[in-house]
């Protein structure tokens, strides 16, 4: 008997039924208390919000029903159906199908996980392609971590979607075959097509019920499309049944195969495929008998079975191969899930030290976590991080990480060396380009820039790298919104993800368009950016304005404001003579802002102060072949302290961009007088009103600079005001306290 236990949430009797959802997720459960909460949580986190979850409990005797009830009380999308006695997974799924209301139905097992973007991605692609059935690739992982995670379909699909016809589908389900078993996949099916085909699960099957349903549906004309997206996480553990075979299960599969032949129209190609699968079932039955006899010590009986069925005996090589593989792999890696305080930082940045604003901010956050006693690991899942650098030298600042690993790199002391020789070739070409440009023999620009690694699309090998190395983290820190889709591949549902957003990328497009420029990094539309951010448990925003934008778009998401902390010097200094300083990396906001300063501000400053000198530090210098008189381009500088000490005035003339301008806070911490635009002060303008001179008009900007150059006393007074503000508002405790406590509580 089935009892529905969600009437109270659906309303009183006679109330209008709720609108049908896009997707009904069907979940059969039998004694699944160990994993069902995580499975349901992964469904609740879907970016496709318009769904229902139908859990059919198949006579469980553990507390899994209580777990589902508790979650259903908090989320009306979850419905629970209960069976007094176990009737098997097919019967449970038929019960769920009978009450499903979605346009599509998706199967998720109670011990598995799905990626937050899975349902939206599959549904969008299936509808665009006209598929009735959509399946994705499976990431297969072992609960005890004795085998590395792997993808099921990657070799079959080769990274591209593929239509699967019925004979190919049947043939792939040969037992102990070399081809991936498509019957293991968990389908998304158009419900109306399934209804018209009059297909249901075979309730006599203890395993292989998804294969049978899809084979029957395809025999009645439904079209199956397989996609390479690695978004279903299939868990292997000691009590799961889907990968275990015994005599009774194989007998049920043989009987099902016979019924299938009798009920569908069998073409010659389908007949051949069915025969391959049927022979594999027969061989597997003999193999199971041989293994059982060997375990009982009935050697002669096992030998006779092997002689009668050489194919069955040949399957013993699989067991031997598995044992040899296990021996070659060595003892199982100790489980890491018990390691308290382990924080894994996922990043595609080229982080080697405080060489640019985003690296400075990330390392500052990490130092605060380290001071709290947490263990930090830097994990770079993509070799694209190297760009055109054949090696990266890690500065002493990287000691904040207990371990630094980048895929495609060798660690040798403080060096990370790219394994791909093409990177060295690119570096040599780039060096040649710069030399020829400097000698005026050839203009620059003929060497194609390396892609912006931070926003690059992840490959399956990146995902598997995270799955193997981030497993068991207490918390995940995603460096930029682009990294949040990688966090679930840590396969640790209890580990919260904190995304360090750095910038609100979707605001940058309009900002650059307003000044007739193009961003040097990635562009994101607001919908996609907020969707990426929503996949994290908490967003770490660098300033209030962007935090407010996230809260407005994702009202149920935790947002932590954590501006860059600064360590103030003891006292302000006036600097030396008419010396100005600008510090910046080679990014579009710095390039555009500096050009504006050169064209609109610098001539006025030089007219009033002919001895004025502007020192530019950082690789922004690479963007300028020529500079105005009085400008010195230093390039990257290992130690900025002497430059700040000598500078009379620090300028930040940015006219576009987002985030908190890291160099503004750094300069204030050095006790320097500063002139900045409103873009440079975005998010902290009111806070810094008393200690930074603001100007968006070029003449006013120049007047502020000239006035400060003329008065050492004014510079010192403004520098002291800056130090006072830093001490009160930008100490590590003030900036990072909430973030550190949130992540420390979750990671411990």
Identify the function of each model-found stretch:
Residues 2-248:
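Nucleotide-sugar donor-binding/catalytic module of glycosyltransferases
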Residues 2-17, 176, 219, 224-337, ...:
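C-terminal subregions of glycosyltransferases and related glycan-biosynthesis enzymes
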Residues 231, 645-659, 670-672:
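Acidic donor-binding loop of glycosyltransferase active sites
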Residues 357, 713-743:
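A charged, aromatic-enriched C-terminal amphipathic alpha-helix characteristic of glycosyltransferases
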Residues 361, 552, 561-645:
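Conserved catalytic-core segment of nucleotide-activated headgroup transferases in glycan assembly
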Residues 417-485, 514-535:
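Conserved nucleotide-sugar donor-binding subdomain of glycosyltransferases
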Residues 498-499, 506, 530, 534-570:
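Donor nucleotide-sugar binding/catalytic pocket of nucleotide-sugar-dependent glycosyltransferases
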Residues 663-666, 673-677:
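Short hydrophobic beta-strand element within catalytic cores of glycosyltransferases
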